Amino acid sequence: MELILGSQSSTRANLLKEHGIKFEQKALYFDEESLKTTDPREFVYLACKGKLEKAKELLANNCAIVVADSVVSVGNRMQRKAKNKQEALEFLKRQNGHEIEVLTCSALISPVLEWLDLSVFRARLKAFDPSEIEKYLESGLWQESAGCVRLEDFHKPYIKSSSENLSVGLGLNVEGLLGALKLGAKLSSL
């Protein structure tokens, strides 16, 4: 069965590649600005459901589509993608030395199965080096990440402790997705 990643995220694409999952990447447009909630869990769930509805429009026989959305929560305050460098700096100041949560809602739809998962990755952070913050902001890497969180590079050396489910922190529950894909394969062979 052909798998489509309904996301432009290079991090999500890399996660699938690292797990040996073959896929085609296609952008799905869903207007997250239409969501009025400020609750991080509700927001990420509704954004993923919206993307899932868009995916249903693309769904063809013998095709499965995976979508996901992530937000960061610091003290239950939602951080989405920063709109500019000043907002990025404010996000990083709130995260500095605190616990962050990356809430990721992942979903799969196929002709035989619909799977949706909301998971949380938690990390306790050490204080950021101010000169590294400046370099990070200048690099522009923060622009495509919810809450400017990049566990694969900038945030990595500052993690004091974290939960085990790193793929959730990177934006896709790969372990859950693998289980859903196996179940889907079994169901389609019946």
UniProtKB/Swiss-Prot annotation:
Active site per database record: D69
Reactions catalysed, as given in the entry: a ribonucleoside 5'-triphosphate + H2O = a ribonucleoside 5'-phosphate + diphosphate + H(+); a 2'-deoxyribonucleoside 5'-triphosphate + H2O = a 2'-deoxyribonucleoside 5'-phosphate + diphosphate + H(+)
Compartments in which it is found: Cytoplasm
Keyword Cytoplasm annotated: yes
Major localization class: cytoplasm
Cofactor(s) this protein requires: a divalent metal cation
Assigned EC number: 3.6.1.9
GO cellular component: cytoplasm
Sorted UniProt keywords: Cytoplasm, Hydrolase, Nucleotide metabolism
Top-level class of the enzyme under EC nomenclature: hydrolase
Any one GO MF annotation of this record: nucleoside triphosphate diphosphatase activity
Record-level GO BP terms: nucleotide metabolic process
InterPro entries found in the cross-reference section: ITPase-like_fam (IPR029001), Maf-like (IPR003697)
Role summary: Nucleoside triphosphate pyrophosphatase. May have a dual role in cell division arrest and in preventing the incorporation of modified nucleotides into cellular nucleic acids.
NCBIfam families given in the database record: maf, PRK04056.1
Protein family (similarity comment): Belongs to the Maf family.
HAMAP family: Maf
Protein name (record): Nucleoside triphosphate pyrophosphatase
